A protein has these predicted regions:
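Extracytoplasmic
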Residues: 69-72, 113-115, 149-151
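N-terminal export/targeting leaders of redox proteins
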Residues: 1-49
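Surface-exposed patches in mature extracellular/periplasmic domains of secreted proteins
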Residues: 74-79, 146-151, 181-188
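Electrostatic cytochrome c docking/interface patches
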Residues: 38-69
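Sequence/structural segment immediately N-terminal to covalent heme-attachment motifs in c-type
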Residues: 57-82, 88-102
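C-terminal capping alpha-helices of c-type cytochrome domains
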Residues: 128-144, 156-184
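Electron-transfer interface patches adjacent to heme c in soluble/periplasmic c-type cytochromes
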Residues: 28, 93-133, 157-167
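Ligand-binding pocket scaffold of soluble enzyme catalytic domains
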Residues: 14, 29-38, 45-46, 145, ...
Length: 190
């Protein structure tokens, strides 16, 4: 084999392997997104969270469920108490979300701070916030009820680094969960 021909074969193999790695990386990323969507939708179903996906992108809602429930731990602060009281919980029983107060706020952090209701209000918007308002709160930490003041407990500095697409998925998921009636869980809805 001539040197120029050998060089051509080596170059073709190299380019083919690089393209193959890039394609596999893209496939893996897509599969990763798909698996996060599946995990999010399965979690909601397993916990009895009835999602209203009509008119919404199911994959976006599923990704939002994954981010809210598996990554963000929003239930830990925005539900009081976060899980049902199962006496066998420490013996390996599966945890069960407190569905009656799911994300309706009411968790106390000292004498002056209580977590907010982030379920959809009567207008269908989570916490009564438009997408633009929600994005502003997450990006700046500014309290929507007290402009110029920061949210005291909310870990917004962590969430502000998320992509707009991820935050949109969270917003769409919060729009798709059931609202909780006013004053059911100790925190009035607006």
């Amino acid at each position: 084999m001539r040197p120029s021909m050998l060089l051509g074969v080596v170059a073709a193999v190299y380019v083919g392997s690089v393209v193959g790695v890039i394609v596999r990386a893209d496939d893996h990323g897509k599969k990763d997104d798909d698996s996060r969507v599946r995990i999010g939708l399965k979690y909601a179903k397993d916990q009895g969270i009835n999602l209203s996906v009509k008119g919404r992108d199911r994959e976006t809602v599923g990704l939002g469920s994954y981010l809210v429930n598996a990554v963000g731990g929003c239930n830990d602060c925005h539900t009081a108490p976060p899980y049902t009281q199962d006496p066998t919980a420490f013996l390996g029983a599966p945890k069960q979300v407190n569905i009656a107060c799911y994300l309706a706020g009411g968790q106390e952090f000292g004498p002056f701070v209580v977590s907010r209701d982030i379920t959809p209000f009567e207008d269908g918007k989570p916490a009564g916030l438009t997408w633009k308002q929600f994005l502003h709160v997450i990006r700046t930490g500014e309290d929507p009820e007290n402009p110029g003041q920061l949210l005291q407990v909310m870990p917004w500095p962590v969430y502000q680094a998320m992509s707009d697409d991820d935050l949109r998925a969270i917003y769409e998921y919060l729009s798709a969960i059931p609202p909780v009636p006013v004053n059911v869980c100790g925190v009035p809805s607006e």
